[in-house]
Amino acid sequence: LDRGVPFEIDMEGRPLVGDTLRSALTLAGEGGPLTIALQAYLNRTSNDLAACADAGVSVRLVKGAYHGDIGDFIAIQEKFRTHAETLISSAAPFCAATHDPVLIDWLKGKMQAHKNLIEFAFLKGLADGTKTEMAAAGWKVAEYVPYGPADPAYILRRERYLTTLGHLGRSPVP
């Protein structure tokens, strides 16, 4: 952090959230650009957003890929919107990481005049057309590249999400 290199902390399952957030807040006290992923489907996220704002920690808002406090797809979308509204009203830059076309379109509508305050993040290999189209339209776009020994579990969570979308008659952005 002392060299000014941006540092991002991903979020894992619910049992690790408290310790992960405490670590991020401790690191934030040492300075340097720090971002942490916060999950919309956890009841604690409103408080975590406030703690991050107080500490100057940037947020990458995700819906969540583990078992959270909220399991209903539509309810998670609503929580995502609520948390995004909090981030938007803060006027601090943030990242939205979702492949949900409903949420992406909603955010684009909300942020059209403030493109500099939002970055959209997508998983490598998904939404390539959307990434290219959004970048060409002036949106900040990032690609998340997962790595590490937990590939099978990671892939399983993404497959479960895509299956859920299919059952709802939806699909991720192209």
Q: Which residues fall in each region the model found?
A:
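Positively charged, amphipathic and often flexible ligand-engagement surfaces
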Residues: 1-174
